[in-house]
């Protein structure tokens, strides 16, 4: 299945907030050339919360068409309404996505039995591989280890993305030893090199890969193949970038960085805002430290 560096892709937008399809196509081709292992579209970093249902489905179709079997497209298809998540997952299946990423239902804070029923019903609706997504800092909802264990027995549920501390990754790995079919993906760029070196994750679903795709893939390849020294060296070069990309709520900073690189326009949808000027200098310095070419104003 999917290992290494998977990018949590931004949704490029024009200044008026409309989707920039030309820029999206260019980003997909750039990630293919950079050997990114899969692209997650219309997820948190892709501003799924402010996409219309039609836009969400159109992004899935467009990315699958542009990828043309050159790279797997994973659809962000999660929702806090089970019926909507099923609708998005069916759309992802029918347009040819390789898998779906399913965030825990946010805001309504279901009990563990509700989480199990939610994901089980989605898995039953479409024969599409599913990756669970646990990000309690955003959702106010945490999947218990017992619930993960139960869900992993369902045929189409193939892994989990954990945007959680190192200790939780270690607990998940104890449940699912390496080389099993159930995969573990890190969701915190700053932790992924160490976690991969320790064998705790099989890949990362990365924000940093938006701006440094080749470096992230090289780092993960080294970490997963025992070249720990080189993995740590690459991670050290990216350390300031990992931090700076979260100086404000994701994807504010990463979209600004991509704009400075000349990859996308400055569009972002309310209630998110363009990056506050007080962060411009530090993020620019982090990009330069990572060896990334930026455009001068």
UniProtKB/Swiss-Prot annotation:
**Domain of life, source organism:** Bacteria
Q: Which reaction does it catalyse?
A: L-aspartate 4-semialdehyde + pyruvate = (2S,4S)-4-hydroxy-2,3,4,5-tetrahydrodipicolinate + H2O + H(+)
Alphabetized, the UniProt keywords read:
Amino-acid biosynthesis, Cytoplasm, Diaminopimelate biosynthesis, Lyase, Lysine biosynthesis, Schiff base
Q: How does it assemble?
A: Homotetramer; dimer of dimers.
GO BP: diaminopimelate biosynthetic process; lysine biosynthetic process via diaminopimelate
Which pathway does it take part in?
A: Amino-acid biosynthesis; L-lysine biosynthesis via DAP pathway; (S)-tetrahydrodipicolinate from L-aspartate: step 3/4
Molecular function (GO) terms for this protein are: 4-hydroxy-tetrahydrodipicolinate synthase activity
GO CC aspect terms:
cytosol
For this entry, the protein name equals 4-hydroxy-tetrahydrodipicolinate synthase
Q: Where does pyruvate bind?
A: 45, 205
Active site: residue positions: 133 (proton donor/acceptor), 161 (schiff-base intermediate with substrate)
The role this protein plays is: Catalyzes the condensation of (S)-aspartate-beta-semialdehyde [(S)-ASA] and pyruvate to 4-hydroxy-tetrahydrodipicolinate (HTPA).
Any one Pfam family match given in the protein's UniProt record, by short name: DHDPS
Identify the InterPro entries for this entry: Aldolase_TIM, DapA, DapA-like, Schiff_base-form_aldolases_AS, Schiff_base-form_aldolases_CS
Q: What is the protein's major site of localization?
A: cytoplasm
Top EC class, one word: lyase
């Amino acid at each position: 299945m999917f290992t290494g560096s998977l990018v949590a892709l931004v949704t490029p937008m024009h200044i008026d907030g409309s989707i920039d399809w030309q820029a999206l196509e260019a980003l997909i081709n750039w990630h293919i050339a950079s050997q990114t292992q899969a692209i997650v579209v219309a997820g948190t970093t892709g501003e799924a919360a402010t996409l219309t249902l039609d836009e969400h489905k159109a992004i899935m179709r467009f990315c699958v068409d542009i990828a043309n079997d050159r790279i797997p497209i994973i659809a962000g298809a999660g929702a806090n309404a089970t019926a909507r998540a099923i609708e998005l997952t069916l759309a992802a299946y029918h347009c040819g996505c390789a898998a779906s990423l399913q965030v825990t239902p946010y805001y309504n804070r279901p009990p563990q039995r509700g989480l199990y029923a939610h994901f089980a019903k989605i898995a039953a609706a479409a024969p599409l591989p599913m990756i669970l997504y646990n990000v309690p800092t955003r959702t106010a909802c945490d999947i218990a280890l017992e619930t993960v264990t139960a869900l992993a027995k369902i045929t189409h549920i193939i892994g989990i993305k954990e945007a959680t501390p190192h200790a939780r990754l270690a607990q998940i790995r104890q449940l699912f030893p390496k080389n099993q079919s159930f995969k573990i993906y890190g969701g915190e760029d700053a932790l992924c090199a160490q976690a991969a070196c320790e064998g705790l994750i099989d890949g990362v679903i990365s924000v940093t890969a938006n701006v440094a795709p080749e470096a992230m893939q090289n780092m993960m390849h080294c970490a997963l193949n025992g070249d720990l020294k080189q993995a740590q060296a690459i991670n050290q070069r990216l350390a300031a970038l990992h931090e700076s990309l979260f100086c404000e709520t994701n994807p504010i900073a990463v979209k600004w960085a991509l704009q400075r690189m000349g990859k996308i326009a400055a569009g972002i949808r309310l209630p998110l805002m363009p990056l506050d000027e007080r962060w411009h200098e530090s993020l620019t310095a982090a990009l330069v430290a990572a060896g990334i070419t930026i455009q001068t104003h």
